Amino acid sequence: MVKLAFPRELRLLTPSQFTFVFQQPQRAGTPQITILGRLNSLGHPRIGLTVAKKNVRRAHERNRIKRLTRESFRLRQHELPAMDFVVVAKKGVADLDNRALSEALEKLWRRHCRLARGS
C-alpha cells in the first residue's frame, strides 16, 4: 500500500536547497501562485513554501495556504517527478477559497508532470 506521509526528507529545509531551485527553475504559475521546480537526484520529490507577509498579511491566512499546499503535495507525491519544488504565494492568493486554491495547485502539479516528461 502507498504511504501518504509527509516526513522530513520530503521538505526543503536549508537556504542552499531553496537556492538550488531558484537558480534554474521550471515555472508553472497562475496569477496567485507559482510553483518552481528543478530535477533532483534523490528519486523523490521535495517541497518548500514561501508565503510572504507582504503578500498575505494575516498569519491565519498564511497558515491556511501552507496547510493546503502541503496537503496537496502529500496526496500527489507519488505521481510527481523527482524534483525539488518551491511554491511561491503571490498577492491575491488569500482571496481564494480552499476549493479554488486546491484546484489551482492540482492544475500546477499536472503542468509540472508534463514539463518533466517533456525535458
Curated annotation (Swiss-Prot):
Entry keyword DNA repair: no
Primary enzyme class: hydrolase
Keywords, in A-Z order: Endonuclease, Hydrolase, Nuclease, RNA-binding, tRNA processing
Pfam families: Ribonuclease_P
GO cellular component, one term: ribonuclease P complex
Catalytic activity, as annotated: Endonucleolytic cleavage of RNA, removing 5'-extranucleotides from tRNA precursor
Protein's UniProt keywords contain Protein biosynthesis: no
EC number: 3.1.26.5
Oligomeric and partner information: Consists of a catalytic RNA component (M1 or rnpB) and a protein subunit.
HAMAP family from the UniProt entry: RNase_P
NCBIfam families linked: rnpA
Name of the protein: Ribonuclease P protein component
Organism: Escherichia coli (strain K12)
